[in-house]
Amino acid sequence: MNALTAVKTNADSVTRSDAGFTFAPSVQSPRLLELTFSAKTTAQFLQQVEQWPVQALEYKSFLRFKVGQILDALCGNQLQPLLIKTLLDRAEGALLINAEGIDNVEQADEMVKLATAVAHLIGRSNYDAMSGQYYARFVVKNVDNSDSYLRQPHRVMELHNDGTYVEEVTDYVLMMKIDEQNMAGGNSLLLHLDDWEHLERFFSHPLARRSMRFAAPPSKNVSHDVYHPVFDVDQQGRPVMRYIDQFVQPKDFEEGVWLSDLSDALETSKNILSVPVPVGKFLLINNLFWLHGRDRFTPHPDLRRELMRQRGYFAYSTRCYQTHQ
């Protein structure tokens, strides 16, 4: 694992609309920041990237960074340092991002372009085996027969980290709302690791560092298991996690009981945030010290929600940011 820490920059002061966006703490928590691109910035960005369809971003990976450069330039080159600082800051590490004028499923391709630009200002999104691309789009409906909780609407999808069953580093997760019809409930659930009341109890347990087997169901298109502990530490010795209840495979009674207790302790935390994410908005979180999940939906025969995700690793210039003890 490689949780990184940012050197402080003057990005703290970037809250002005003249930068092309606004930036402020969310109503849910000061750890979760809201970033909103102005209608002017959004329109200029879409106009400048119109020449590249989403397929071009799929086929030519360097274009993902180019669209990021365009977005950053429209924001006076103040966006990238702010994103990096926020994602690496242990006290924050989460963003709810909105672009004025993008709020309809008919703009799905524009949503993918915007999310791609933001993600590739902080790093690179990994190959997603479920979709065969660097991003995945999937639909939640009222009835589901899939082999994981990802698309099941009428139950809580428990708190977890992404990237637990792959070997690639998964520093960040991006989750975007593309469409929503006949929908009530289903808020995103977030828990910052430092706000979890039972962290010390489980982090100090002998099983916290034991390598465990993680195996994905067939729909994930991953053919081999991976092994790693549930807990690790960052460069400064602070706890980080790689955990998901559905895919960890305890080898014995001791591991099974400990994992069950851990799951219960996460789900009963009093500090879970419930965050509505309207169509066109997306969450971007540090995957190593934020856990995420989803609340249940209210049943409806025509329920439909479409989501897009990207997950990847941090990469940035060490002239401004570095790891340190």
From Swiss-Prot:
Its cofactor is Fe(2+). GO terms for biological process: L-lysine catabolic process. Its EC number is 1.14.11.64. The keyword Manganese does not apply. Fe cation binds at H160, D162, H292. Binds 1 Fe(2+) ion per subunit. Keywords: Dioxygenase, Iron, Metal-binding, Oxidoreductase. SUPFAM superfamilies: Clavaminate synthase-like. It catalyses: glutarate + 2-oxoglutarate + O2 = (S)-2-hydroxyglutarate + succinate + CO2. GO terms for molecular function: ferrous iron binding; glutarate dioxygenase activity; oxidoreductase activity, acting on paired donors, with incorporation or reduction of molecular oxygen, with 2-oxoglutarate as one donor, and the other dehydrogenated. InterPro entries: GlaH (IPR015038), TauD-like_sf (IPR042098). Pathway: Amino-acid degradation. Acts as an alpha-ketoglutarate-dependent dioxygenase catalyzing hydroxylation of glutarate (GA) to L-2-hydroxyglutarate (L2HG). Functions in a L-lysine degradation pathway that proceeds via cadaverine, glutarate and L-2-hydroxyglutarate. Belongs to the glutarate hydroxylase family. Homotetramer. This is Glutarate 2-hydroxylase.
